[in-house]
């Protein structure tokens, strides 16, 4: 009863307080509510009398979709280009298409038809998402397969179905930790899919908007002048409180000092010689402060250049000491924006290039011993584990350190390409090197175990070609021809095989080995029962990839015929050159 009394008392007090309010307010509120109810009921009754299919819909207005803009096609473009553009825009819904005609680029452009013969037209397109790009790439592959009866070369396209072997590899890689060169490129699946269609030299790149902005492939396929005009600087909010202020006195001072050091280095590269090396070194040391990583790197470049010209002014141990001074600098250690793992990788590559420049001053074993000690010491400054074998240039330089050349005129792919540009014009001379066969075998096995350990993976073509040229200049012709046959069999396109035949003839002529030339022209040149140049030349409709390539082969064959005119195979080569 007491509890009930308390509850009843509370209810009575609430009722009294409620009715103690002004009567006018209560009646006004009740009247407004009643009016609204009557109005709503009237509207409901009116709407109920109208059939549902005649009532006005209260939906949002329909937005008009923007039409996809189709870019203009280049003049004299093939019909297949129009088909791919229509397919990408109308069927797949890709946007922001750009078409690049590589025949319009200047001859010295790295993507011009004079420099490469695989790409004629490049299409860039943006997808809405990674799933959209994957679906478009999947449909594009099926279209090319059924229309042109071959499978295109597609890279960057990955689905959710991963094999057990791949999962084990990924798990093993996770346990090792990310390499120092790890980046976001390639991690996001289907953010960049490249498709070599194999049709009229058309290459298609499908990218997400973020990846397209970060890669800026337009710069790669555009003329440099056009790219500079279209380059836009980021907008700056001029209403900001600190607009126009510099980062600070120390930063501006470091930039000014770096410019001074860069000018000294550029002056030495242009005007420096054996006698003025000491003067440039003293001027550089006078302005060197060591307040930034860039200053130490510029000092390394200058000292390395001086060492090549006058080794008495700058010795090899001084160049190595520059690197250790950079990592022991307290001023640099306090700068948190420095990525030391990246610096370690760059310095390792630069040190290996310096060892290559030493040439015959040290033997290959001495150079590799120096490199081993350098890597052991510099990796102590790394915050994370670094896998140098993931860097292609590291493997190439590692192989390069297995041999030395006294006259520094060794041949490689770049030299042979330059000879083709000069239409076969080269200075006569014997190209021989001193190759450590045991070291070469160990380095080859080291690369295979650390980077190419999978049964499905082999040495890339550029590395196999580098090794092949090494064996040829070292006089190891059995290993040369074995690698040569392996490379020739791996080339599926006829135009690639034609180029390989031309550079082989140039290489053997430059090395000037009579037995090797006789082996080429008697066994492979016009072999009716196997691979031969004549067969590939006929299959390619008696065409070369460029006129420079044709003239280079013609001039080399004429030189071989004149030098070995007593040999039947040399005379046949000269007769073939007369018809080119």
Curated annotation (Swiss-Prot):
Major subcellular site: mitochondrion
UniProt keyword list: Membrane, Mitochondrion, Mitochondrion inner membrane, Transit peptide
Subcellular localization, as worded in the UniProt entry: Mitochondrion inner membrane
Protein's GO biological process: mitochondrial gene expression; mRNA stabilization
Membrane topology: Peripheral membrane protein
Function field: Probable mitochondrial mRNA stabilization factor.
Alphabetized PANTHER family for the sequence: ATPASE SYNTHESIS PROTEIN 25, MITOCHONDRIAL (PTHR28087:SF1)
Protein name: ATPase synthesis protein 25, mitochondrial
Organism: Candida albicans (strain WO-1)
């Amino acid at each position: 009863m007491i509890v009930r009394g308390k509850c009843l008392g509370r209810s009575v007090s609430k009722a009294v307080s409620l009715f103690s309010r002004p009567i006018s307010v209560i009646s006004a509120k009740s009247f407004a509510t009643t009016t609204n109810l009557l109005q709503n009921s009237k509207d409901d009754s009116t709407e109920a009398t109208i059939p549902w299919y005649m009532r006005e819909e209260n939906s949002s207005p329909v937005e008009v979709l923007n039409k996809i803009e189709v870019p203009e096609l280049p003049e004299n473009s093939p019909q297949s280009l129009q088909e791919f553009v229509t397919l990408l825009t109308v069927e797949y819904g890709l946007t922001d298409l750009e078409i690049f005609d590589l025949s319009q680029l200047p001859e010295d452009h790295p993507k011009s038809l004079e420099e490469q013969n695989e790409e004629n037209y490049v299409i860039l397109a943006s997808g809405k998402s990674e799933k959209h790009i994957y679906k478009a790439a999947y449909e594009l592959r099926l279209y090319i397969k059924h229309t042109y009866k071959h499978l295109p070369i597609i890279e960057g396209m990955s689905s959710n179905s991963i094999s057990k072997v791949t999962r084990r590899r990924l798990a093993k890689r996770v346990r090792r930790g990310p390499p120092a060169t790890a980046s976001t490129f390639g991690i996001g699946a289907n953010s960049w899919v490249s498709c070599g269609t194999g049709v009229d030299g058309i290459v298609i790149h499908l990218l997400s908007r973020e990846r397209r902005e970060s890669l800026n492939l337009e710069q790669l396929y555009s003329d440099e002048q056009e790219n500079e005009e279209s380059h836009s600087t980021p907008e700056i909010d001029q209403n900001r409180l600190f607009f126009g202020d510099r980062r600070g006195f120390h930063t501006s001072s470091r930039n000014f000092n770096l410019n001074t050091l860069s000018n000294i280095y550029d002056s030495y590269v242009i005007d420096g010689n054996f006698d003025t090396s000491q003067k440039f070194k003293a001027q550089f040391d006078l302005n060197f402060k060591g307040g930034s990583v860039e200053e130490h790197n510029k000092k390394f470049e200058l000292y390395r250049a001086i060492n090549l010209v006058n080794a008495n002014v700058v010795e090899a141990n001084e160049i190595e000491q520059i690197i250790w001074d950079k990592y022991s600098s307290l001023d640099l250690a306090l700068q948190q924006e420095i990525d030391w793992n990246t610096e370690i990788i760059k310095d390792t590559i630069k040190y290996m290039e310096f060892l290559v420049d030493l040439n015959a001053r040290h033997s290959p074993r001495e150079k590799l011993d120096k490199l081993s000690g350098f890597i052991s010491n510099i990796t102590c400054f790394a915050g994370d584990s670094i896998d140098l074998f993931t860097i292609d240039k590291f493997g190439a330089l590692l192989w390069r350190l297995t041999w030395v050349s006294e006259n520094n005129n060794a041949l490689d792919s770049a030299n042979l390409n330059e000879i083709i540009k000069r239409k076969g014009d080269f200075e006569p001379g014997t190209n021989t090197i001193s190759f450590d066969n045991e070291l070469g075998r160990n380095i080859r096995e080291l690369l295979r175990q650390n980077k190419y350990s999978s049964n499905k993976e082999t040495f890339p073509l550029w590395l196999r070609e580098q090794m092949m040229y090494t064996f040829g200049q070292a006089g190891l012709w059995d290993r040369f021809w074995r690698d040569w046959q392996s490379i020739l069999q791996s080339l599926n396109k006829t135009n690639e095989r034609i180029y390989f035949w031309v550079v082989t003839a140039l290489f053997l002529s430059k090395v000037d080995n009579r037995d090797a030339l006789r082996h080429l022209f008697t066994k492979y040149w016009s072999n009716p029962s196997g691979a031969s140049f004549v067969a590939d030349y006929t299959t390619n409709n008696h065409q070369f990839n460029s006129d420079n390539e044709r003239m280079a082969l013609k001039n080399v064959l004429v030189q071989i015929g004149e030098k070995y005119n007593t040999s039947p195979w040399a005379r046949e080569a000269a007769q073939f050159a007369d018809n080119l």
